[in-house]
Amino acid sequence: MAAAAPLAMAAPAPTVKLGIDLFSLRSQNWTPFQLLDYSAKLAAKVVHFSEIRFIGSLEPENLRSVRRYAEERGIEIEIGMRSICPTSKMFDAKAGTAEEQIGRMLDSATLAGSRIVRAVLGSSEDRRPGPIEKHIESTIKVLRNVRAKAQDHNLKIAIENHSGDMQAHELKQLIEESGKDFVGACLDSGNPLWTLEDPHLTLETLHPYVLTSHVRDSSVWRVPEGAAVSWVRMGQGNVAIDEYCRKYAELCPGRALSMESIVTNPRVFAFRDPKFWEAYRDVPAWSFARFLEIADRGQPRAAEPRPANPEAGRQREREDLEASVEYTRKLLGL
C-alpha cells in the first residue's frame, strides 16, 4: 500500500512587515485617512508617517482618530519628524528648540500608537563647509537631553541616514554615544549612495540598531566627473536590491520594510574634482572602493521625461510605488 502523501507544509511566516513610507505619496495631497485607505489596498502592514504634514496635525483628537482608523484596518502606525539638529541647515528653529519639538513628537507617538519617532540630522548640505562631526555632536547632546522623556514614554527615536548627511559609521557613532537603549536607526537603502557608500555596507554596519527602514532601488554608473546616481523602481537598479532585502529580512526580523518610492533623474558626484572631497574627508578608502565597484558595473540611465501636468505626475508617483510594492511582495513572499 502506498504511503499517504505528506501534508503540505505551511508557508513560513513573513520575517518582516511590509510598510509604506508616505513620502512615496508626497504629491497626492491626501488626508491621513485617504493615505491609510490607499495603503490598505496595497496590503501594507505598517504606514510610516515620516513627516508631520502627512498625519495632518498633532492635535490629540486627530491623532486618536488616525490611530483608530489604522487599527480598524489592521495597520501599524509609525510617526516621524524632520531635523532635530540645531546646527543643521534643515533645522526649523521657529518650531521651538530641538528638545521641545522631540517632546511634542513623543507625546504624539503615544497618542497615535507609534512605538518610535523617526527623525533626521540633516542633509548633504551639512557636510559643507562641515565638518559633519559638529552636527553629530549637536544631535547627540539633544538626544541625551530627551532620554528621560523617551524612556518615560517607553519609546525609541529612530535616526535616519538621510539625504547624504551621514555614512553608516557616523550614524553608528551617533547612536552609541546618544544611548542605544533609546536611540536606533531608520535604515534607508537609497541614501548611502549620496555619501559614496555601498548600501550593503550600511546594512552590515547598522543592522543591530535598526528600528525601522525605508527601501528603494538605485542605479549607479560612472561619468567623466565621477559617478551618477538615480533612484529607481524596485528591481530596476544595479545595487543588488534583492540580496539587500533578503539580508534585511534575515538580520532585522520583525521590523518594517517600508517602501520609500522616489524616482529621480541622475545626480552627479564629481569626485574627480579635489574640492569635492572637502565634504567627504572622512570617507575610508576601502569603503569608497566598494562604491566604485557598484558604479563600474552600472549602465547610464536617461533622464525621465517630465510629466505633462501635475495630475500626470501624481499618477506616475502612484504607479512607481505600486510597482515597487508588488515587486517586493513577490521577492519576499509577503
Segments predicted by a language model, with ranges:
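Alpha-helix N-cap and loop-to-helix initiation/capping positions
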Residues: 34, 57-65, 93-101, 130-141, ...
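Catalytic domains of carbohydrate-active enzymes, especially glycoside hydrolases
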Residues: 33-53, 108, 112-116
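Hydrophobic faces of well-ordered beta-strands that scaffold small-molecule active sites
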Residues: 16-22, 47-49, 77-82, 117-119, ...
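Acidic-and-aromatic substrate-binding clefts and catalytic sites of carbohydrate-active enzymes
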Residues: 25-30, 50-62, 85-98, 125-129, ...
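Active-site acidic/histidine proton-transfer and metal-coordination neighborhood
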Residues: 3-14, 69-77, 88-184
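Histidine-acidic metal/acid-base catalytic patches
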Residues: 3-6, 11-17, 33-35, 40, ...
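Mobile, glycine- and charge-enriched loop segments
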Residues: 12-29, 67, 71
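Alpha-helical scaffold elements within enzyme catalytic domains, especially in hydrolases
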Residues: 38-41, 65-69, 108-111, 145-149, ...
